[in-house]
C-alpha cells in the first residue's frame, strides 16, 4: 500500500503542477486515455493553488461531455471530502459532485445546506439543483417523464 500511495501522490503532484502551468488539454487527453486516473480527482481538488482547483473543475466539466461514463470514477474520492475541515475543499468537492451528477451524492449534499460556511451552503444548493437538472433532462430524453 505504501508504494501505491507514494506513486499516487507523485502523480497527483505531477498533474497539479501541469495544471498550474496551463496544460489542461494534455491532462484531458491523459484522463481520456487512462480512466484509472479518475480516483485522483479527490487528491487534486485539495491542492491549495487556486489555479489548480479551477483547472480541475474545468477538467471535469470537459470530461463530463467527452467521457461521461468514466467521470463516475471520481465519485468515491470526492464524497468523503464533503466533511473536510477546509471550506474550500468542501465547496469544490460539492461542485464537482454536481458536475458528475450522481444521485448518490444528494443525501450528503443536503447535509451541506447547514454548513457553517455560507459559500459551501450555496455551492451545495447549486450542486443539488445541477444533479436534479441533469436527471430531469435525461428523463425527458429517454421518455421517462
Please report, for each region that a protein language model flagged, where it lies by residue.
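Structural detector for internal amphipathic alpha-helices that build alpha-solenoid repeat scaffolds
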Residues: 13-33, 46, 51-69, 88-102, ...
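Amphipathic alpha-helical scaffolding segments comprising HEAT/armadillo-like alpha-solenoid repeats
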Residues: 2-10, 32-46, 65-81, 102-114, ...
Amino acid at each position: 500500500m505504501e508504494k501505491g500511495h507514494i506513486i499516487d501522490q507523485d502523480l497527483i503532484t505531477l498533474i497539479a503542477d501541469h495544471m498550474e502551468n496551463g496544460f489542461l488539454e494534455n491532462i484531458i487527453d491523459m484522463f481520456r486515455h487512462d480512466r484509472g486516473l479518475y480516483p485522483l480527482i479527490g487528491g487534486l481538488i485539495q491542492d491549495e493553488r487556486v489555479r489548480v482547483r479551477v483547472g480541475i473543475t474545468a477538467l471535469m466539466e470537459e470530461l463530463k461531455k467527452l467521457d461521461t461514463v468514466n467521470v463516475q470514477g471520481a465519485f468515491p474520492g470526492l464524497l468523503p471530502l464533503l466533511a473536510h475541515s477546509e471550506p474550500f475543499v468542501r465547496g469544490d468537492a460539492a461542485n464537482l459532485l454536481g458536475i458528475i451528477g450522481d444521485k448518490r451524492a444528494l443525501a450528503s449534499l443536503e447535509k451541506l445546506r447547514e454548513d457553517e460556511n455560507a459559500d459551501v451552503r450555496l455551492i451545495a444548493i447549486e450542486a443539488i439543483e445541477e444533479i436534479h437538472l441533469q436527471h430531469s433532462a435525461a428523463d425527458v430524453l429517454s421518455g421517462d417523464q
